[in-house]
Structures are given as structure tokens and as C-alpha cells.
From Swiss-Prot:
Annotated keywords: Methyltransferase, S-adenosyl-L-methionine, Transferase
Keyword Ion transport: no
Result for mutant: residue 111 to T: Increased ability to produce scutellarein-4'-methyl ether (SCU4'Me) from scutellarein (SCU)
Family of this protein: Belongs to the class I-like SAM-binding methyltransferase superfamily. Cation-independent O-methyltransferase family.
Protein name: Flavonoid 4'-O-methyltransferase 3
Regulation (activators, inhibitors): Substrate inhibition by genkwanin (GENK) at concentrations above 2.5 mM.
Keyword Kinase: no
Record function comment: Flavonoid 4'-O-methyltransferase involved in the biosynthesis of polymethoxylated flavonoids natural products such as nevadensin and salvigenin, aroma compounds which contribute to the flavor of sweet basil, and exhibit pharmacological activities such as anti-allergic, anti-oxidant, antibacterial, anti-proliferative, and anti-inflammatory effects.
Effect of residue 297 to T: Almost exclusive cirsimaritin (CIRM) production and lost ability to produce ladanein (LAD) from scutellarein-7-methyl ether (SCU7Me)
Residues of the active site: 241 (proton acceptor)
Upper classification of the organism: Eukaryota, Viridiplantae, Streptophyta, Embryophyta, Tracheophyta
């Protein structure tokens, strides 16, 4: 049967026009804890069983699952539902919390990424709507709780990727300070894997004050724009993409001051946007992250390799390496 290219184009246009519903539907399933329910059950579940366990009525649940099965998230056999390798990545221990954060009004608001917002430069959602800073508005407590849970989940996954794919990064290190380390999830996982390392979780005093104790991790409060605790290495995991180039250079200079001039290094764990068409499996996701930054953060962005090199040169680093860790992030190691 001949392929009607015009029909294909129209179908593709409809897919783009409606594509936002893909993540919306998946977020609804995560909110209903369907991936965790199926995982805990350990086998096939009927619609009635899944409805009872999730608290969602049969008819809307059926339609939701029909959509997600069509898109390859879950599987179905003999009118019963089951996990797939993909849906397992959306349990509470994986990307589930990140999906919930992306579903909050702050993240999803069309005010963030609109033509008008881009023209006026008010891409930060709360600034464009209320003239307030997203980090300090108490009315957005729900978003911030979801954000915190998402960052914990992300830290676990990224630390695991480093342990699996670049353990040599910690060879010879006695101490590592995680700048913006919040409650120490990432550095805690890394210290577990590399017990000869003393970890330091460094964040604002009000954040580290609530941190639970972690073996091998010290918590230090402070301001990364003023000084960074001294260590053999400094790690910046998903920190610099929040800031403008000028602010990133300030942060990097403070990190450079905190490490030994002859043996220290700064480890930047962040996305690198690919612009040469070669890329990898995560190239599209990295571009999507940049659209989120464009919508939510006034100054932040994901950067290309050339843009990262510019920051490192301006901050006074003499050399650097880049390591692919089979993740949405890479590890950039910068040396004084």
C-alpha cells in the first residue's frame, strides 16, 4: 500500500500538537502509584484489582492504561496489566518523583515557555505571573516538596551511573565536597561505594540543618558565592545549569580556590547539549531539559561542549576531560 506523505505529515502534526498529554498521562499513573502497585504485586493484575489498589474508578483507569499501553509504558496480557522494563523506571525509587515534579503547576504552566515570555525575557514562571522568585515563594510549597523528592531520586540515579561507569573518578581522593548537596543523597551513595572518601555535603545553612545523619558525610552550611569547603575534589551535580555564565564563572572560581593547586579537580556532573548531529540516546532528553530551563529558570540553561569550555577557561582552569557515564549527564573534570 502506497504511503500518503501528506496524511503522514498531518498525523505527525497532530502528534506534536497533542504530545504534552504523553507526560501528563504518565504523571497521572505515577501519582496513582500504578508502577509501584504492579511492581509490589509481582505479576499480572486485572482492571478490578488495579482499580481497588489505586483507588481509581475502573472506567477512567481503563482509558488511562489503554493510552499508556499504546505508547509502550505498560503491557497487557489476557485483559490483565503488568510492568514493562520501561514502566519500572517510574517507580518511587527511580524516576517516579521526577515525573511528579514535572506535573506541578509551576513546571507545567504555559506562562513559562510562551512566545510573549521569550520576547520579554520573563521566562521564569513565577516572575512572569507574580513577580516573585521561584525559590522563595511559600505559596508553592507543593512544587518545592515535589522538587526536593525529584532531586533526591535524580541524585540516587546519577550517583549509581557514576559508580557503574566511572569509578576511577574517585581514585586517590580522600575528600570530596558536594556543592549544593542538599541532604547528602548523592555524596552519601558515592561514599558508600568509595569508603576511603570523606564526603562533605555543602548547602545553605537552612537546608543542611534538616539533613539526617549519613555515615561518612559531614554537613556544612554556607554560600557557594562566598567560599567552598576545602577538599581534594569539588563536585557540582546539576548546579551550574541553574545559573548565568557570569554566575557559573563565580562559582567555579570559588571551587577552584577550595582544591589543591597541583592535585585537585572540580567534577561537573551536568548535561552537554550535542549540536553536531551525532549525539547519543539522551540527546533529545537533554534538549527537552533545556526547554524546561528556558521555561522555569530566568538565567539557567543546558550548555554545549563549547559553552562549557568557555566557562572553564574564564574561571582559570588549565585543562579538562569529559567522561560519558551512560546517563543524561556527563562528568566534566576540570583541573587548576
Amino acid at each position: 500500500m502506497a504511503v500518503d506523505k501528506e496524511v503522514q505529515l498531518h498525523a505527525q502534526a497532530w502528534e506534536h500538537a497533542l504530545s504534552y498529554i504523553n507526560s501528563t498521562a504518565l504523571s497521572a499513573a505515577v501519582e496513582l502509584e500504578i508502577p509501584d502497585i504492579l511492581e509490589d504485586h509481582g505479576g499480572l493484575m486485572s482492571l478490578s484489582e488495579l482499580s481497588a489498589a489505586s483507588g481509581c474508578p475502573r472506567e477512567p483507569l481503563y482509558r488511562l492504561m489503554r493510552f499508556l499501553i499504546f505508547h509502550g509504558i505498560f503491557t497487557k496480557s489476557d485483559d490483565c496489566y503488568a510492568q514493562s522494563p520501561l514502566s519500572r523506571l517510574f517507580t518511587r525509587e527511580n524516576l517516579g518523583p521526577y515525573m511528579l515534579m514535572q506535573a506541578t503547576p509551576v513546571t507545567r504552566s504555559p506562562a513559562g515557555l510562551s512566545g510573549e515570555a521569550l520576547k520579554t525575557g520573563t521566562s521564569l514562571y513565577l516572575k512572569s505571573i507574580r513577580g516573585e522568585d521561584s525559590w522563595s515563594d511559600p505559596a508553592y510549597g507543593y512544587h518545592m516538596k515535589a522538587f526536593t523528592n525529584a532531586m533526591i531520586a535524580h541524585a540516587r540515579l546519577t550517583a549509581a551511573a557514576i559508580v557503574s561507569n566511572y569509578p576511577a573518578a574517585f581514585d586517590g581522593l580522600r575528600s570530596v565536597v558536594d556543592v549544593g548537596g542538599r541532604h547528602g543523597t548523592a555524596i552519601g551513595r558515592l561514599v558508600e561505594a568509595f569508603p576511603w572518601v570523606r564526603g562533605i555535603a555543602f548547602d545553605l545553612p537552612e537546608i543542611v540543618a534538616d539533613a539526617p545523619p549519613r555515615k561518612g558525610v559531614d554537613f556544612v552550611g554556607g554560600d557557594m558565592f562566598e567560599s567552598v569547603p576545602k577538599a581534594d575534589a569539588v563536585m557540582l551535580m546539576w548546579i551550574l545549569h541553574d545559573w548565568s555564565d557570569d554566575k557559573c564563572i563565580e562559582i567555579l572560581k570559588k571551587c577552584k580556590e577550595a582544591i589543591p593547586a597541583s592535585t585537585g579537580k572540580v567534577m561537573i556532573v551536568d548535561a552537554i547539549i550535542n549540536e553536531d548531529g551525532e549525539g547519543d540516546e539522551f540527546s533529545g532528553a537533554r534538549l527537552s531539559l533545556d526547554m524546561i530551563m528556558l521555561a522555569v529558570m530566568a538565567q539557567g540553561k543546558e550548555r554545549t561542549y563549547k559553552e562549557w569550555v568557555h566557562l572553564l577557561n574564564e574561571a582559570g582552569f588549565s585543562k579538562h576531560t569529559v567522561k560519558n557515564i551512560k546517563s543524561i549527564e556527563s562528568v566534566i573534570e576540570a583541573y587548576p
